[in-house]
A protein has these predicted regions:
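Metal-cofactor-dependent catalytic cores
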Residues: 1-179
């Protein structure tokens, strides 16, 4: 299927109850019919006019935190891609990032401020390559970390949200400076 973006048909689009963005409707009746039938309710396919993010624009997670999850779960390893973090850093103790709320973080040409914990969702239970549910990450995280408070309520938290104070280029291997 193909469709064109109709910028004359702008709509306000709710982003999970957190904010509203302006988006353009993707023209062509086949799109709305296809997705409406799939979801069992009337929907429209739209394209955001500007980039959008889930809760906060950046997330960070330590590789030692992922290794600790694997160790506590009796697994050889856990693929960190399942957590969809923008930045993964190496070094430090497991869950060191939990202590960075309100702290300035510099990486590459960007400056971030640590926010609150990332409440994980069921998407993390899916293999990043196949999409198949293969690991009960929420249960595994909760088993050793408990359920923790986040801005989205109590749940299995893993990683840290960040605000971007100064945008800049970030590359693999850039040094992360805390404070």
């Amino acid at each position: 299927m193909r469709g064109t973006v109709d910028s004359a048909s702008a709509v306000d689009t709710d982003m999970w109850g957190l904010r509203t963005i302006v988006a353009d409707v993707v023209a062509g009746p086949q799109w709305s019919t296809f997705f409406s039938d799939l979801l069992g309710k009337r929907v429209r396919l739209v394209q955001a006019r500007q980039s959008a993010y889930d809760v906060h624009p950046a997330t960070i997670l330590g590789s030692s935190s992922v290794a600790e999850l694997a160790r506590r779960s009796g697994l050889a390893s856990v693929d960190p891609r399942r957590f969809r973090m923008l930045i993964e850093f190496s070094g430090g103790t497991p869950h060191l990032e939990d202590s960075w709320g309100g702290t300035l973080l510099r990486i590459g040409g960007a400056v971030l401020r640590g926010g609150g914990p990332v409440k994980r969702c069921a998407a993390t239970t899916r293999d990043p390559a196949s999409g198949a549910v293969d690991l009960q990450t929420l249960r595994l995280i909760t088993a050793y970390r408990g359920r923790r408070e986040s801005e989205l309520g109590v749940g299995a938290t893993f990683g840290l949200y960040c605000e971007v104070l100064e945008p800049g280029t970030v590359a693999v291997g850039d040094c992360l400076r805390v404070g």
